[in-house]
Structures are given as structure tokens and as C-alpha cells.
Curated annotation (Swiss-Prot):
Pfam families: LRR_14, PK_Tyr_Ser-Thr. This is Probable serine/threonine-protein kinase drkD. GO terms for biological process: defense response to Gram-negative bacterium; negative regulation of cell motility; negative regulation of phagocytosis; protein modification process; response to folic acid; signal transduction. It comes from Dictyostelium discoideum (Social amoeba). Residues 302-343 have a biased composition (Basic and acidic residues). ATP binds at residues 857-865, 878.
Amino acid sequence: MEGSFQFNKSKQTNNNSSLDSNNIINDNINNNLNFENNNNNNNNNNNNNNNNNNNNNNNNTNNNNTTNDTSKTSANSTSTEDDEEDILGNRKKDTTGSRVLPMDTSLTGAAEPSKKRKNTQDDSEVEVQYHPQKRASFSLNISPTQLQNDLSLNIFNVSNSNNNNNSNNNNNNNNNNNNNNNKINNNSNLILNSSVDSTTSSNNNNNKNSNDNQQPQQQPEEIEGELNRERQERDKMLHEEAEIEQYKYGDGEEGENYEIMVTPHHRTSFGHITSANSDETTNNESGSPINSRKMVTDEEDPHSSHNEDHQSDQDNHGQFMNDEHQSTDDDQNKSDNEKESESARNSGDLQQKVHNSKDESTVSTPQHIFNNGNGEGEEEDDDDEEYDVPLRIQTVANNKSTKLSLSNCWLKVIPTDVWSILELRDLDLSANQLKKVSKSIGLLVHLKRLRLNHNQLTALPKELYSLPRLTTLYLNNNNFKVVPKEINRLTSLKTLDLSFNQITDISPQTNLHQMTNLVELRLRYNQLSSLPQNMLESNHLQVLWLEGNRLPLNKAILKKSPSEILSFLRGYKPPNKKVNDKVINKAHVNPALPPIDTASTIAVAQVFAQKELDTKKRKKENLDDFKKQHIETELKLKQLEEELQIANAKATKFEEEASLLQQQFNNPNTPTGPSLNLPSILLNQPHLGWDQQQQQQQQQSPNVSTPPISTSPVLTGGQQVVNGISQISLLSPTQQINNPPSPVTQFNQASPQHNNNQQQQQQQQQQQQQQQQQQQQQQQQQQQQQQQQQQQQQQQQQQQQNGSPQQPHVNNNNNNNIQQNKDHQFPVPTIPAKIIEVEKPFEWEVPLSEIAIGARIGRGGYGQVFRGSWRGTEVAVKMLFNDNVNLKLISDLRKEVDLLCKLRHPNIVLFMGACTEPSSPCIVTEYLSRGSLANILLDESIEMDWGLRLQLGFDCARGMTYLHSRNPIIIHRDLKTDNLLVDDSWQVKVADFGLATVKSHTFAKTMCGTTGWVAPEVLAEEGYTEKADVYSYAIVLWELLTRLIPYAGKNTMQVVRSIDRGERLPMPAWCPPKYAALMNRCWETDPTHRPSFPEILPIMEGMISEFQKEKKESIAQGRPIPYVGPPEKDPSNKQPPQNMATTIQQQLAQQQPQQLLEQQILLQVQQQAQLQHLQQQLEQQQKLQQQLQQQIAHPNNPNNFYFQQQLQQQQFQQQLQQHQQHFQQQQQQQQQQQQQQQQQQQQQQQQLQQTGSPIDNRLNYNFNNSNNSDIQPMQQENNYRMNINDKK
């Protein structure tokens, strides 16, 4: 585009940019001046150019003062008169205070300590504390429709401001726009603090001599498109809450580190060119200078040291990274004209929204800008930031928001309340001090975006890899050394950033080629030297960043697509490492000498160090100073080795430098020609004497200027090499006993300090002895090499006989160097060969074939327990899981079993041996018949008084005291009632102790079943200590008290959450006070507040003695034994049985009333049946009487039947009366018999109580007789009735 949006690339523009920035700063500092005065001054300076060129744009035909008023009213056309008064009132208030930048009320709010941020997802306001390093967020309540309806108002921000300048000055050109853009780039907050009119005044002041170029008005369609694009980018910035640290740290998300990106002429996102010579005017998007670190101090930023470490590498790769990531930056996808137009319109658009937004809650500004640049109030901001964390979490939970940002909050542990927000989609935990991530992150199943960059993480929990919807994961700037193998379980992952870590290798088991959704992979600035073969087959990657590693990739290859980079690595073949012939020729050294590795260089240094040690001992120097120097130099040696390997991208560079040192050592008398260039790490040390060397060089050649500090000094002789490397690599004398002293005296011949004849003779003798020793060592090494060659030949012959392929043999670098340097005058000292110790046979090995395995009796977190027999002894065999068994695990297992089998204690399960075969590893222990304490406690049929339970807990404490008293300490790691076994004499023995190797190897499996017994610090993955066993012992005490399962009815996550919150198991009201106090002490959250097992023993012993005393007193006084348990199960409420006789008596007493009731009911039924039968007989007799009466009434009846029937009736009535009397007598007899039986039972009970003798058989006899006596009258009655019926 043309007009004011064009960019002027002339030198005059670059010179004006620095002046403009200074003028803008001065304008912002003196912004309290009146608006009309600034513009009037400009108009007075330009009286000759009034309103000549802007009649078409602004229709302003007034004089200078009226023009200023018109521009002011047009700039504030969207606001009311009341708003203008408020703005002017606030500006006046700002002028009364100290050097506070004046701002509108819609932007400042500096009087309030806490600002309000507008939520991006809803209209609710969120109070958020601001950290001093956070940038302001521009959240404006302007809808897209409002932007489209107010296009006429938006246009004047770009055009009217510049046109007013044309009307007043007639000199608004490209340089003006350039100044506007520079002002926007200098500080994002200055855009907010300055108004449209102050911008025009600065342009008028800075551009008096520029060319006259009139700006044409933009078309509404073009402006509408540009505004829509700017609005979308600004909404994206608001949604992601970009911070100033993003550009400083260089995490690669919204932008890269500008210290890397900036070149001598680099085009920024606003379209202007930054010069490499102007450090103060070159700024990034966040508003901070590139080469200045004034915004962030070392104390405020824990990551600044990391950026400084990589500064040299970043400078080398600056241009390269600019070219490589050109396709990923949004700004570089646009043309230059579009960038220029966007920058100009962006300034006007922001200014328009400054006037439109009057609510303080919509805009927030960092407070550190208003502290005069001296950092005042930063400590208060840090406190507010810590206080702000729970407020953010609570606000997100209340609003049901899907995004939570806790970045730059100095968190060491993630708050547990975060895991309760299950609706989270976006979680930002960057720029904290996190070392571990809780396993509860697996609860956030809806999480899509997770940022953990700029922390101290070394590993991730396995629950994180089960998140099904995670698409973006940032892990850059941490301490990862390997790529997690479980990362391929994140099937939805699209972006993965592992840059700026310490990754040295990517395992083939990672299977990154199977992650088809992964399109962006960032592995910058690690220590990768190769990639797995299956990763090279990945064809789904669209972005692959590999710069800053040790891969053989140059800039041209890194610019290519990921597929081309991977194809190049597939066909790459590493060349043979050779010494650079050019460097050797410059140093006048024999080019046939091969390079040496790190170990050989250190060996050379150690020889010099040993020689210096001997000379210092002869001089009897202070040993304390010597030890301090030893420690310092040992650290410097490690630093030398690490930094040389890390700083050099090529692996051969360090070897070349080491080779130069060796060559200088082997040829001390070489003529001084071109000097040797050594790394700066060797030479930037003030105590090494390099300054003296420089002084000598200056004395010899005064006209030659000394090199700067950044360049490495040079060494012209062997004495400086000796002094420098011996000072740095001074090692312990114990490590150098076998090393012979080095011929340092050869280098001392050239120095004027050693010219005595005696010293020369001593030196010659020492040289002869050293040469003899070295010759002997060479002979021994030659013999060893011959033996090795013979062994290799024998192995090759065996392989040829067996038909196996031959493997090429790789010689050691040290041996190669020694063999090739045999002909040289001064042989190279070497490191003594390591003696390989022959592994001793395992003493406690139990072959699996000798064990007869029976039924399974249990199952644990890392094995199954079987009952078995070994050599006639009943044993328990624990078969370990062999999922990932390797040789190291078997070796560690043997060491631990060797230690455990030597333990002997009555409260410890006896280890008898182990089978260490990789196919079936197992442990053999003694077998205890009663089983585990957990099964005994859950069996209600087994009665256990309080004294027995106290004794069981005391036995457990004794066993744990013994384990913790061993050296080294044996930590159980899984103490619970399932691992406490009971023998026949009710003695507890601790089982499954030790085996840290197996338990740590299967920690996840163990945690699944024993979460309720695990200490809080173990759940937080802070490691096991002996106090973790004390916490588990508290849960065991609770089980002994209640005989219940802890945390019954809760799943694992609920238990973990309750333990993290500090919740503990409920304490019953009937618990003894001393016992409850001990439990509360043992399950304290702070491990330091928990007692040790030696402290627990006397407490348990005191409670046992008190219970025994109470028990004896209660027995002597005839009272029941003291009971501790639920009141409903108290046996004292019931009469306890004394012996078997009383139990039988009680059973009979309960059975007899029931039998009597049944007999009475039967008698009543029988009597009713008899009465009914008699009534029927009476009715029949009445019928017969009626018939007889009828016969008597008739005279013709010849028989006297009436009298016969009357006699029979009388007889029948008599029999009936007799029967009734007999029935009554039987009832009376039964009652008497029952009374007699009751009397007999009472007498027997009294006799049993007095004598205690068992009941004789008389009870059964009487009982049978009573039953028979009841049955006989019934049979007699039935017989009598049958006789009567027969008679009838």
C-alpha cells in the first residue's frame, strides 16, 4: 500500500528512529502538560503551513487553534461530555503525584492494589493479582458488529490524526508513520498512556525537515478487512494471555527468543527495520530491549541464567533460526505492505478503543510500570501472587470455566483444589518451580492443552498419559533426560515441545512414528546425537525442530521439510574421526599423531597434578589450604569436561583440543611458531597466570594489541600448558597412586628460575626412573593386549565352529593411542586398567527344582505366595512378577537377599533363601500357621481381649525397631496387617520387609492395593523414609482397635484425595486416651513430628502393664475383665457361661416352657374335639327320645321300648359324668407333675452351682417320664371312647 503506510528504508529514517524514541519517552514523562499547549506550540512552529492539504480529509477551515480543537473533538467523538470531563480530571490528578505516567481511567486504576481482568469466556469479572513481570491484557467489550457499524469512527484514528498533522505542518510522510510504529514497539504500555493528540505532537516535533508526501485516504473495504484481521489476532492474544516471559524464555509457542531471531537487519512484526548498531532502540513485541535486561533482574527471573548459558549458541544460530521458522510465524506469512498497514491501523485501533472503554475492570496494567523503574512494591506483588492462586482456582470453579492459568506463581507443589475442576480444557502451569506432578492429573479427562514448561521436571506420572483428549503438551525448559516411553499413549496429541532439556537419547520403544496425529515436534537445544530408526520412518510430521543438538545437520538441511530431514538422516553415514591436518601443521606438530579422547586428556592432567602435589608436600605447605584448592580444582575439572562436551556441537572438537595438549606435551622443545588456540574455559580463570603471559607478550612486542577477553589467549610454550591444566585438573592423591610422576622438568628447562646444577641432576634422575616405569607399564600393557588378542581368536574359532556370526571387535581409544605412540620419545601416561572382579557365587541360592510348591495362600502387589516344602521344612514361597526382569534387577535382588537372610529376631520372619533365576525369581521364608493378622481381625468368631491386641501391636513395633536399627536402615515400604504374620503362640512377625529393588520396580502395582497405608509424602512422590513406616503403623493400630478395614467403601482416588486434605480415619469415642494420642502422633502430616519406633515401644509397654494390673484387680474382686470395643458387643451385658452343665441347663430352661405350651395347646384341641363329639351324641339321644315319645303316644306299641331306652340314657349320663371326672383328675395330676419337675430342676441348679459337677442322666429320665405320663391318660381316654362307640 502507498501513502503514510509505506516504509522508508533510507539512512535518514534509521537515524530518526533513535531520535523519535527519545522524544517519545520525553513526551510520555511530560505528558501532564496541557493538550492545547502542545498543539499550539506545534502550530506556532509551523505558522506558514496551515490548512492547505487536508481540506478533503477533515473539512477543517479554521485557524491553528480551531484545528486543534476539531482534531480533539473528532478523536473523542464516540465518548460523551461526561467522559471527557472524567478523562481530563484524571489527568490532572496524575500531574499532582510523583513521576506516574498519566493514563486514562479506562486503562490505569493505579490506586487499587488488585486489578480486575475480564474473563474471556463469560461476562463475569475476576479479580486477579498481577505479578510485576506480567504484561497488560487488552480485553475490550466491543463486539464485531459494533466494529463494523463504527467503521467511520475507526477510520479517523488512522487518517484524521495524520491529516491533522498535514493541515498543521504539511509534512506528514513515511517517517511519521515510522515514528508511530517505533513508539508502539518501544513499550506496549506507552501506547495506552499516550493519546492521539500527543502522538501528533511528537510527530510534528520530530519531523520538521522531512519531505512532503500527502496520504490518500484508505478505502473502507480495505480498512474493514484489515480491522477484522487485527481483531481476530487480538482476540487470540487475549484468549492465550500472552506474557512478557514468552519472548524472554523462548518457549516457541507465540514467539521465539529475540536474542536468537534478531539479525543485523531484521524486520519486526510492525514492519520497521531494526539496526544492529542501535541497542537501545531495538525492541521486541513485549516492549523490552533486546540487549538489555533491565525489565527482569536475576532475583525475579529464575530462568535468566539458563538463557545466558545458551547465549553464545543462540548468537551463532540467530540467522539460521530466523530462516528456519519463517514458515511457522504468522507475521511472516504477510507481505511487507500488509505489515506496515497493520502496524499503522493497529495504533489507531488501539487508541480508538482507549477512548471507548471506560470501565476499569476491562483493562489492567502491571503495577511495576508506575514504580519509577526502581522495583518498588515487587515484594508485595509476590505476596499478592501467592495469595492470588486460591482465588484464581475458586473463581474458575465458581464460573465453571474451562481454562486455568497458574503461570509464574512460584509454585513448588500443584494445589490439590485444581484436580477438583473436572471441566478444565486448558491448564497453564508454566514458569513455576515444580519438580513433580501429582497422579491426580488423571482426573482431568477433558484436558486438551497442558503447559508445564519452565519448571524443574524430570519425569511425569503415568496417569498423565491416559488423558484421552490432550492435544497440546509443552515440556520445554525442564530437566528431562529421556523422552518418556509412554508418550505414545497420548493418541490425540498434536503438538509436543521438549526443547531446552537434557535429552540425550530417544528410545525406540517410544514409537513416535505410531502417533499419527502428531504434526509438530520440537526438540531444540538438547544433546541428541542420533534418532531411532523407527522415528526416521515418520511421515506425518509437519514441523520438526532439531537445531542445537549434536546431529549432523547443517543450516541448509534444517531449513527443509521434516520428511527431507528424516530422509537425509536415514541415508547418513558417519565419517571417520581424524585430526585436523591444518591445525596440526600450524602448531608444527607431527601430523601422524592421532586424536585422544576425554579420558586420555584427564589422565595427562592428572599426571601434572600428581607432580604438583609432590612438590607442595616437600615444601610443607598448609594442608587446609591445599584441601580447599583440591576441592575447587576438582569441581573445575568436572565443569571443564561437561562444558567442553556440551558447548561444542561437533564431537571431534574437544578431541582436537585434547590432541593439541598431548602433542604439546610430547614435543616440549618445538620451536615457537603459530600458537595453540585453547577453549575459553581453560583460559578465563584469573589464577592460572594467563595475565603474566600476556604481559610478557606485551613486553616482547609492545606494538601488538592484546586480544579481548571474549577471545581465547594463546599458549606459546609447554610451561603454560602444564600450569594451566594442572591447576584445573588437580585431583585426589588417592586416585593417582598408580600413576607415575610426569616429566614436568623438561618444560622447566626453558624457564630462568631453574638453573641450579643440583636441581638438574635430580630432574635427570627422576626422568630416568619415570622412563623405566613407563617402559614396564608398556610391556605389561603389550602382554595384556596379546592375551586379549588370543582370547578373541579363541572366541572367533568357537563361533566359527558353532556357526554363529562373527562380531567386529572395537579397540579402546586409550590402547590405540598407546600402541600408536610407542615410537615417540615421550610416551603418554594412561589410566590404569580396571580390575574386573569375578562375581562370587550366591550363598543363599535355592534351586526351584528343590521346592515342592503347593496351594496359593496369598497375593501381593509384586508377587504371589504359595505354601511349599523345601528339604523337609514347611516354607512359604513368594513368586515375584517377572515382567521386566533384567540382570541388574537380579544382581540387586541378590544383594538384598544376602542382607535379609542374615537378620535374626523373634518378631521378624526368617528369610531362608531365594531363587534368582530370571525366568522364575522367588523368595523362600518360614511358614506361619495362623496366617496374617488381617484375617484374624476380620474373623469375629475369634475373641481377642484388649490385652492381646496391645501385645500384637507391641510385637510389630519391636520388629520394626530392629529393622530401623540396622546399618543401612531397612525400610519396610509396605507395612500393613496383611504383612504381619501370627504363629501358634500368638506372636507377630513382620514379613515382606526390605526388597526395595522389587518394590520400587513395581511401585504402581503396590500402590493400587495399599493406598490407605501409604504416607502423604509418599503419595506426593517425595520418597520413602523410616517415618513413612510409622504412618503405616498408625493405620495398623487403628485396625487393632476397631477390627475393621480402613477406608472401606472408597476407591483409590477418594482415599488419595482425603489423605492429601489431611483427613484421617475416624477415632471411636470408646478409644483409650493414651492409645488415641499415640495414633494421632504417628499419622501426623509432617514426618518430622512423628515418633520413631524406639519412642513407641515404651508407650505400648506402659499401656500393656496398666491393662494387666486392671485385669488382675477385676478377677480378684469378681468383676468382669476390662473391655475395649463397641458397647453393643460388650460381653458383660450378658451372663457368661461357666461350664457345659450351665449351658445345657439354660438350653433346657429355654426349651421346657415351649414344650409345655405346645402340650397345653394339644390338650385344649383334644378337649374341644371330645366336647363336640359328646354334643353330637346328645343330639342323637334327643332324637331317640322324641321317637320314643311318639311310640308311647301310640297305644298299639306291643313292646315296652320306652323304659329300656330311658335306662340306657341314664347309664350313658353316668358314664359321661365319670369320664369328665376322670379327665379332671388327669389334668390335676399333670399340674402336680409339672410342679414337681420345676422343683427338681431348681434343686439341681442349686447343686450344680455349689458343686460344679455335670448333670446326671436323671434330667433326661425325668423328662422322658414326664412326656410318657402325659401321653398315657390320652391313650386311656381314646381307648375308652372306642369302647363306647363299639357298644353303640
